[in-house]
Amino acid sequence: MDYGKYGLKAYGALPNKKQMEWFRRGRSIFFHFGMNTFTDKEWGDGTESPEMFNPTDCDVDSWVKSIFEAGFELAILTAKHHDGFCLWQTKYTEHSIKNSPYKNGKGDIVREFTDACKKYGVKAGIYLSPWDRHEKTWGTPEYNDFYVGQLTELLTNYGEIWECWWDGAGSTEAVYDWERWARTVHALAPNAVIFGSLGATPWVDVRWVGNEKGIAGEPCYATIDASSLVYEYTTELNSGKAGGERFIPAEADVSIRPGWFYHESQDNLVRTPENLMELYLASVGRGGGMLLNIPPSRRGRLEENDVRSILTFNEMLQKAFASNLLDGAAVEASTQAKGAPSILNGGFFAPEENDKSPTLTIKLPQKTKINTIMLGEAIELGQKITSVRVCAYVNGEKTELFTAKSVGYKLIKRFDSVTADEIIIEISGSLDAPVLDKIGAYLINDIKNEQEKCAKISASTKITDNVAEIELGGIFTFDTVSADWFTEQGYKIYLFNGTEYDLVKEGNVRGYFRVRLDNPSDGAYRLKIEFEKDVPKDVDFILS
């Protein structure tokens, strides 16, 4: 749309073409597959033998076929996780698939992945962990040569790459040349968005949402100040900032299971299609993107439960938004840019500059039952709206349906069903003249949220003398550690931050062991409890 010919101007930080394509996709897939799949851990330490990697029935083509059939247009593969084990034939390390039994050392999972993406028309993305716990040069300036070498292999030998995903694990302790890495991506994969934060902030296109639960904030502005990424302020990452200095939308990452890697113990803890629908509304429906992880098993296959869930989720999604109930409605605007086509006919709603409280009224041809409204700004002109109220006339009375502090590329709000013949959108706050280019009303079947099923904590415990180490099978929120164990002694509880243990609680217990942490943990994969006396081998610790 050429908004300039209607006298409309852009405001503030603006999206680039890559970000607009990212918005259009809406939802993407993550495949966590690697050494951790075979060690039953979430984070490896780099000491694992390559011989442990041996999928017995690997079919990467079927992974991509499944997610293509479920409507996903982009998938990211963990080419290398923190343990440093590489899923391609890299020349920079022996800690790779070339020294595994898989296809007698001739296999290349990255090749199989990118070939399948080309076959099904799915865009390929790469996760190359900045942190490498196996590589001896990690933490030194020399590691940058090593990393750029591997990055170059991935970006030149496997076709076009559309997303490069960098997380911050281990990044505060290393000397990374983020600019050099980013310039490598820009040169070799010019259409790829870069996901990242910390030192990579000047070059990133997409930001972390501040949690690994797949939930964006309310509001969730695509604009944000750079400092929020540099220091990973999770509250700001989740909500963004109206009028922020950078345009960096939020990607909400979440796993279909409690863990990011496959654990057989979690086969019955797969998120339901209903829960995936809720997460879609809490990410894409709040102006962000959805990044859903599906971990292949030790066989090298996606499990049936996982595939069934995403296929049903896609069916629900397509059905929910198949019919815009505003079709055939009449539109009245308080004011409208001269010559602008109607928003219900492929146009937009842009009030005149002097209209400080613009209102859009939609008169339905008949009384219609609705429970969902979708709005969207012409985001290429900037994210402007900071306050909107949507009402409907129900039985002749004006009834508020919802209010919101941001709209962005897409806002989807559900509410209790009403039967209305008129819908009113009132924009009461905007940084500049607002422009809406999307509006829809829908009746979505009730969604029974079964997320509680997925919140159960799976963990394995190793007890050595007076120390209990608990390895979590994913990221969980918990604030209480307990055990059906009567004891009288002192204790210290530590949470693993990725590189070392942090002391979070100490004290004495007399009676059954039950300790409440001062602050909930929602990002640790591992914890350790040190006691004054030895711990019985059969003690079962419970996190809640």
Residue ranges of model-derived segments:
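Mature catalytic domains of secreted/periplasmic carbohydrate-active enzymes
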Residues: M1-I385, A392, F402-K405, Y409-R414, ...
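Aromatic, loop-rich ligand-recognition surfaces of beta-strand-rich domains
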Residues: N305-T312, A320-S323, G347-F402, S406-K456, ...
